[in-house]
Amino acid sequence: MNHKKFFQNAVLLTATGLILRAAGLLLRVLIANVLGEEGMGLYSLTFTVYNLFVTLAQSGIAVAVTRLVAKHLALKQPAEVKGALRACLLWAAVLGGGACLLLFAGSGFLAGRWIGTPDCTLALKTLAFSLPFMTVSGCLSGYFVGRREVKPGCISQLLEQAVRIALVALAVFTVRDGGFAVMLAAIVAANTVSEGVSCLYLAIYCRLRPMGRGAVSPPRGSIRRIALPVAASRYLSTALHTTENMLIPLAIARYSGSYSLGLAQFGALKGMAIPLLFFPASFLNALSSLLVPEVTDTSARADWKATRSIVERALTVTVTLSVMIGGVFLIYGRLLGAVFFQSETVGMMLTVLAPITPFMYMDTIADGLLKGLDRQAKTLRNNTIDSTLRIILIAVTVPFFGIKGFLGVMVFSNVLVASQIGRAHV
């Protein structure tokens, strides 16, 4: 493990992550001020449906290219590196295009039957066109991560966020009087255009970069062997999360008698409180992505002592940092909710969820470690248990206790997942 390069990459990714999260938080504040809490609920549900197709489009290809590139570089096989990238790009283009067609064709049904209003149809159609760009750029980013080159990915993300913010601001000031459906479509159009810009940048950068002559295609089934467990985990996890997100406003409505209130409280939680809670986690997200090639490298060389050392240090850093962050939210949660969103509800949610911040952050790191160790099946098991239990508890408790019942469900499920991670042995 090259400690200097790993540290440099971690610093670069962390700085990029902080900028992106700060910009993203600013963007959410802007959108929340325009759409309101109920509108944020519909905005969150729109992206819940969209994320289902994002998962279908990505299908673990980015993880596959990262692991294959890291493995072949460790074994000094440059032709195999180029072949792995080509094969994964082909898969990414096919999957992204297929997911785009499915979402575009089914947007009317999904908006009316799943979200509950046809006002979201145009937004879903607009988001569909971002899927091919997203899958290809994700594959290219995974390639560079496998090479321990994080700079291209960082630049593309900064460029993407800058374009997104500029276009959302333009939409807010130009189509504010066009009605909710038009406003929502204009806001998500920024997402589609920014994904296209990011993909174009990465494609040009990769094209201009010398890669040598010759390419050896990866062994038959090698991409599927890595991607399918990751994809299966994400398919199931996303399907369960989609069910959970659709169920929450309905369950709150049964408690309060108002679906509008259910949407408003759901929007406050998923669209405001949770993004703010994960704002400081930029370093951990950077660490998680960098751990995949590092752990893949050491395990490919059967250097289990180095692997265990990486895992132990990653977990120690995660626990230390997350406990401090949780303390800040516990003390200043209500103030932060008032400052950013002028909402007492958001402040209450931050305060309640602050003690489980270490458990939520730990899940991020564990995911990267397990992918690097080729133990995606464990991630699938943990996610399945967690999401299934949450859905059952939501159906049982939220109709009787409202949003406070769901916050209790979140606390319980995160503690359960953390206990499963704690019992895992590398």
Predicted segments, located by residue:
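N-terminal membrane topogenesis motif
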Residues: M1-A23, A79, G83, S217-T238, ...
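Membrane-water interface segments that mark the loop-to-transmembrane alpha-helix transition
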Residues: V63-G108, L122, K305-I325
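Short runs within selected transmembrane alpha-helices of multi-pass transporters and secretion channels
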Residues: L20, A62-V63, T126-V145, G153-Q161, ...
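Interfacial/gating helices of multi-pass transporter permease domains
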Residues: I31-L52, F180-V188, G221-I226, V230, ...
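Short membrane-interface helical motifs at transmembrane helix boundaries
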Residues: G98-G116, M324-Q342
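Residue-level signature of transmembrane alpha-helical cores of multipass secondary-active transporters
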Residues: L13-G17, N51, A92, T126-L127, ...
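Helix-loop interface residues and adjacent transmembrane-helix termini in multi-pass membrane transporters
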Residues: V34-E37, T117, G146-R147, D177, ...
